Amino acid sequence: MKNLSAFVLLCLLATALLPHSVHAQKRAYRAPEFAYNWGKPGLHPDHIVLNMPEDPSTSMSVTWRTSVDVQAGYAEIAIATAAPKFWRNAKTYKAHTEILEATDIPRAEVVSKYHSVTFTELLPDTTYAYRVGDGRIWSEWIHFKTAPDGDQPFSFLYVGDTQNYIMELWSRLIRAGYQKAPEAGFIVHAGDLVNYAHDEGEWHEWFMAGSFIHRMLPSVSTPGNHEYYPRTEEERAQRIRSLSVQWEPGFTLPDNGPAGLKETVYYLDYGAMRLISLNSNVRQEEQVPWLEEVLADNPQKWTVVTYHHPLYSASSGRDNQQLRELWKPIFDKYQVDLVIQGHDHSYARGRTEPDKNQLAGLNMRDQYVGTAYVVSVSGGKMYNMRPDGWDDFKGATRDRGAENTQLFQVISIDDDRLSFEAYTATGQLYDAFDLEKTAAGKPNRFIERQDEAIPVRTHDNTISYYDQLPDGVTEKLEAQHPGFRVISVTYYDEPEFRGYRVLLSDDEERLVLRTDPEGNVVK
């Protein structure tokens, strides 16, 4: 009897631990709610973020936010030492202050002050401590390290779209990235930092989720399509989408891009790398002459480009052909090494063939490679991968993909080698490859390392991202509506409604149905 009881208990425990779909489909997600004034500015500095100027080995910029009651802003900086009174050697900077008046802009509904300082005449590869405030109310002292001077090794983090579930889910991802690469020099954010461009609450989530990481590791941010949205009903009527009202006052990014694209198109040099941000949302053709100039006059060994919309899409139903035809020839001409992108809410990593005029006879399976392209996602919103990989894209191949997986990437450069590693939010190595410089003017040598990583992750072998209808209900609904297929299911457990919201589509028309928990259609 004792053995039988133990067996029954073991079976029950095993059943409870299984990620059983029946258990999952009956659980409605309880999204956090934030108080209306949760993200409003106050007397204490918040939204503190570091950004790098054109030369981050000798300068660094910091920006922060306060209420309009704060009259002025100041920043103090000193070389950090183990002695706690390093501040005796601090230098004080008066901040540039501007007011953001956005009380009439939907979702912003705020008036605040932004303060910014650019520290200059810094020493390369040196740890500094700084603080910001109004002369009476100060932040904590915060460390950062300037860029190395020359060919010293360095690493940085790269993340794709944050956008959704920022505080509740992106926070764990960015903290895992910092934990994996605490010595990283900076973080590249490849667009869609928020979901609604002007939403003050979402921007507050972004700053809270990153917390001290934004204050210690400089952010290199490029705008995504969700950083653009109409500010007024007039703009909406004219289909005008404006850059987030928080972007320019909230960041201090290099101002060396084309006119009219301030702090969205720019470049900076870090160690032996030139890093270029492009704006894939607007005025793409106007960026071409500037890009040609920046690439033609490039003394750095490595070149990395970031922007939002991928040239080679990762997800189903997407293709940015015009952008690919516009920018890829330039990347090829100047042998851009790596392009890091977002937008598609899945992961794809691949490469293009080298210019055959440089090394005739090479093909995609040779060890030499043209530009390597990566698309990644760091937030909690997920899409499906393209089922055909990159087979539709001439001259490109996808080597690795992922669905339903939050990822961060660590990119390291050491002399003639660039190492790329993608990690899951739980710190597992998901993808890896190296690029190795060869003779001048020749393509990079490509070294595949995905055999070091965990198996491919898809919607089929991970905890379901989508809610699931009870067995047989999908087939029943599709039979009742010929030509339509179920494309999304959301389970609700609210006082006013408990059951499923089902979206069906025939590619031209959409149909929304509601069912009870058993799958019976209700009005």
List the model feature ranges, each with a label.
Residues 1-26:
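Bacterial Sec-dependent N-terminal signal peptides
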Residues 22-158, 414, 419-458:
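Acidic, histidine-bearing metal-coordination/catalytic regions of metal-dependent phosphoesterases
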Residues 109, 113-119, 127-143, 202-299, ...:
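Extended active-site neighborhood of metal-dependent phosphoesterases/phosphodiesterases
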Residues 483-515, 521-523:
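Exposed beta-strand-loop-beta-strand "reactive/processing" segments of non-cytosolic proteins
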Residues 158-160, 186-192, 218-225, 278-279, ...:
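Active-site neighborhood of phospho(di)ester-bond hydrolases with catalytic His/Asp-centered motifs
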Residues 298-341, 357-360, 391, 396:
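Active-site-proximal segments of metal-dependent phosphoesterases and phosphodiesterases across multiple
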Residues 112, 137-190, 195-196:
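An acidic-aromatic substrate-binding cleft motif
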Residues 459-488:
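Short, non-transmembrane alpha-helical segments in secretory-pathway proteins
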